[in-house]
Regions:
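Short amphipathic helix-loop junctions that connect adjacent transmembrane helices
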Residues: 1-14, 198-217
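Residue-level signature of mid-helix packing/kink "hotspots" within the transmembrane helices
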Residues: 24-32, 116-117, 225-233, 317-322
Length: 366
């Protein structure tokens, strides 16, 4: 998208940053409302509509010739993707057993990361042929999940139809303190891990140069992808409500160890890769863990609403590049990783605070 906005509309790096940040923020905010409404309707149909909106956004971008419309369409794409992701989690929670949920979510996260790994280089190759090819390919690829969901996904009972469902009331979200702490924890965790590649590249450009930054990113991204693809399912399947506290604590330790490793990696690419591997283990523990925490507190019939509220935590990843830039220009470069260490410790503390809260959703929704 960065290349497209630069080539088609001649936007500079600063304007592209504002445009993409605006689109991401708009997408997240609107996805919250649409995600909450998903509990009132059949989740299968909701996922199909989200995919259709996703595809329409990609089809429309090459057809319009106005940068504002492009940004709005990109916001639509992000909103549709976020809604689909949220409703998919809710469908897992509604239709799978407790022992199966984390395994399937970990498998989903693994496949998702394969897509994130393959997508950028493939998109770059397509851009070399035609600036619009990545958008057409994205629209075509979205047809596959459309067919898969239509054929193999069973209809999910809406909140109002479920026998054991709680009374659907969005105000419950505002009164659930556990949800508040878990969402704040997710915000800080995504601030630390959600945009770590761009964060590292910013850091290296300050302490070295853009050439070495490219080498570092070329090392840490494949390491991150390999660790996630190879270990995510194995780690996620072992996560249960009984052991979640010590395992999430272990994940926090891996995050901290990886960040300390980044501080002392210097110009050694091997140490950058090793630190990225340690850091990524924290990521693959936190991803299914945060899902399980929300699933455990969400009342029946309000799973999508709770996952939508938690998705606000991804704003942390959106804030990271801006915050990293401010830190790197006002403080010593190593301070960036110290701030990230403090953030993940606070994320862990807020998570524990949420775990200690006695479940109150039954009393609220009865």
């Amino acid at each position: 998208m960065t290349i497209y906005l630069n080539r088609q509309y001649g936007l500079g790096v600063d304007l592209i940053g504002y445009a993409l940040t605006s689109a991401l923020t708009i997408g997240v905010i609107f996805s919250l409302g649409f995600g909450i409404l998903a509990d009132k309707f059949d989740k299968k149909r909701y996922m199909l509509l989200a995919i259709i909106a996703f595809a329409c956004g990609f089809i429309a971008i090459p057809m319009v010739h106005n940068v504002v419309l492009v940004v709005l369409l990109f916001a639509l794409i992000n909103c549709a993707y976020s809604v689909f992701s949220t409703v998919l989690k809710a469908w897992f929670a509604d239709n799978l057993t407790a022992t199966t949920k984390t395994r399937i979510f970990s498998l989903n996260y693994t496949v998702l990361n394969i897509g994130w790994t393959v997508g950028p280089p493939l998109g770059t190759l397509l851009v070399m042929q035609s600036i619009n090819l990545p958008f057409w390919l994205a629209a075509i690829c979205s047809a596959f999940p459309l067919v898969f969901i239509q054929v193999w996904v069973t209809r999910s009972v809406a909140a109002s139809e479920g026998k054991n469902a709680a009374i659907w009331s969005p105000s419950v979200l505002l009164r659930d303190k556990a949800l508040l702490w878990f969402t704040l924890s997710a915000f800080l965790a995504s601030f630390v891990g959600g945009a770590f590649a761009s964060c590292i590249s910013q850091y290296v450009m300050v302490v070295a140069d853009s050439g070495f930054a490219e080498k570092v990113v070329a090392v840490v991204l494949p390491v991150n992808a390999v660790i996630v693809v190879s270990l995510q399912y194995a780690v996620g399947r072992r996560l249960t409500a009984v052991n979640i506290r010590p395992i999430m604590t272990t994940g926090t330790v891996f995050f901290i160890a990886g960040l300390i490793g980044f501080i002392f990696s210097g110009d050694n690419l091997f140490f950058w890769g090793l630190s990225a591997a340690v850091f990524t283990i924290g990521e693959i523990i936190y991803a299914p863990g945060e899902y399980m925490l929300i699933d455990n507190i969400a009342p029946a019939g309000m799973k999508a609403s709770y996952f939508s509220a938690q998705s606000l935590g991804w704003l942390g990843a959106a804030v990271n590049p801006l915050a990293s830039g401010v830190i790197l220009t006002t403080l010593p470069a190593w301070s960036l990783f110290v701030v990230l260490i403090i953030a993940i410790v606070f994320a862990w503390a807020l998570m524990l605070k949420g775990m200690r809260i006695t479940p109150t959703q039954q009393a609220i929704t009865c």
